[in-house]
Amino acid sequence: MEQTYVMVKPDGVERGLIGEIVTRIEKKGLKIVAGKLMQIDRELAEKHYAEHIGKSFFEDLIGFITSGPVFAMVLEGDDAIATARRMMGKTNPLEADPGTIRADYAIHTNRNVIHGSDSLESAKREIQLFFAPQEILSYQKAIDTWI
């Protein structure tokens, strides 16, 4: 089973969208194997967005992601990374397909409600940044015995 990292950003938390997003994830068949509400500090934010250091938008990005709590999750399932990315929609909500999380809830590219790993490598790196191994659980969903 593939794992991916997904995070409801501060704008999503502040707007009360955690439940809606979790519902969509579970209805799609992805399993949440770790989750926590947390406040990201600057050090963790810089590690998370290290590839953007030196870019013109870096300080705004760090300021936003540390501005309020986030809901961090590890999702598990067949093709979990691609499935989560399709559910989220394009980064720019104006370009996101109707019915995606960003098309339905995001206001602006810089306030786009949700983050998800874009590759297996980034998923592994982000999961390790945000979760200790003992925080990631393994369990069987009731429907698993029937599939």
UniProtKB/Swiss-Prot annotation:
Pfam entry (one): NDK
Transmembrane segment boundaries: none
Compartmental location: Cytoplasm
EC number: 2.7.4.6
Keywords: ATP-binding, Cytoplasm, Kinase, Magnesium, Metal-binding, Nucleotide metabolism, Nucleotide-binding, Phosphoprotein, Transferase
SUPFAM superfamilies: Nucleoside diphosphate kinase, NDK
Record text on subunit structure and interactions: Homotetramer.
Listed name of the protein: Nucleoside diphosphate kinase
Species, as recorded: Listeria monocytogenes serotype 4a (strain HCC23)
Taxonomic lineage: Bacteria, Bacillati, Bacillota, Bacilli, Bacillales
